[in-house]
Amino acid sequence: MNEALLALDRGDLATAQRLMGSAVEVPEAGQGIGFLQMHEGKYADAVRSFGNTPSNALAIAQIMQGQYADATRTLAAVAQPNGETAYLKAVVAARTNDLQGLISNLRSAIAQDSSYALRAQRDLEFAAFSQTPEFVALVK
């Protein structure tokens, strides 16, 4: 399984697929297969592969499917939320036109890791909000 994830990280999808196929009996295989499916743009399949365990990865697949309510529930249930969790909540807020949710969650992400400020400045997810005073003040 680890070799498959390393191949996926290198962009070697063929090797990752081959190695994932031989690792389906491994308990963590669903996560690895879900990552592979996300790289292939198969987000609905990835959601199924990730299963019911709340994770940032599951939320990303749900966001890419337009399942914002599901992604919100998933992110709220992540066992150990981190800056990425807060950033993803901000993405969901942006996609649902919730400026206050965007600002609140982006503030939390930046408080945990200041690099999220620069990332948010460049992220097209926030383009519609990039000129609002609240957003500008937060990411400066």
Predicted regions and their residues:
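Alpha-helical protein-protein interaction modules
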Residues: D9, P27-K140
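Long, low-complexity, Ser/Thr/Pro-rich intrinsically disordered stretches
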Residues: L13-A16, A46
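Residue-level detector of alpha-helical secondary structure
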Residues: L5, Q17-M20, I103, R107
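N-terminal leader/linker segments that initiate helical-solenoid repeat arrays
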Residues: M1-E3, A7
